[in-house]
From Swiss-Prot:
Pathway: Purine metabolism; purine nucleoside salvage. GO terms for biological process: nucleotide metabolic process; purine nucleoside catabolic process. This is Inosine-uridine preferring nucleoside hydrolase. It comes from the Eukaryota.
Amino acid sequence: MPKKIILDCDPGLDDAVAILLAHGNPEIELLAITTVVGNQTLAKVTRNAQLVADIAGITGVPIAAGCDKPLVRKIMTAGHIHGESGMGTVAYPAEFKNKVDERHAVNLIIDLVMSHEPKTITLVPTGGLTNIAMAARLEPRIVDRVKEVVLMGGGYHEGNATSVAEFNIIIDPEAAHIVFNESWQVTMVGLDLTHQALATPPILQRVKEVDTNPARFMLEIMDYYTKIYQSNRYMAAAAVHDPCAVAYVIDPSVMTTERVPVDIELTGKLTLGMTVADFRNPRPEHCHTQVAVKLDFEKFWGLVLDALERIGDPQ
């Protein structure tokens, strides 16, 4: 049986690859794409979700816009990484085939979780955690019904927005605190893992050889992303963060994990937004959080390339 997921995202260059992977893998049933302010404003990331869905040939999957600001703090976006549009220099069509659902993303998440059998839906947030926290507060019963939360965010060794805080966490640390402290199972796919998911020249050559419109789209955004990484991050290749969370849902053996307590720093002058992972022994017996540690590089990129092949050239 395919694994049912709700992809809560802020597209975003690497979010686009996450959408392609979720749509193109037969082990995933994509129930909804929900959007949240993050890499760009809510209006821009929602438009980008429509764009990627059209390019991928996605039909029948609701796209719903969510929270346009964090729970407490001022909006922080990442145009310096993802571009003014949030999608590099990609051109937009006059209109989209995929329309935006009238429901608020938080309500859609609640509706889907409450209408499906318990423990059958995995939430996969790849942006800030505002929508997920709001859903848990608005309808607390979803916490026991959700199978797992597999999120891209955080980092137990280093940050990227600051020396210790990762972007998706620091843009709404209060929301992250709520999500990590609920009783559901949480898998944190953070920078320690995603910095291993590099779009190297040999990988991009394999994407090029797929030779479809979605593959060419991926190449275009990866070219932009790589140049940003080379100039801003001083890395030779871009780290493709968000699809790592989707890949874990498809096949947990794509990465190794360690079950450790994780909490979010909310008051530190230098450490706001830090995901504090406690690796000390003995580990708590009923720990509900785990962090991703080591990526199987070939298996991960094999999943992405296979998804591109399966998507083909949608009409």
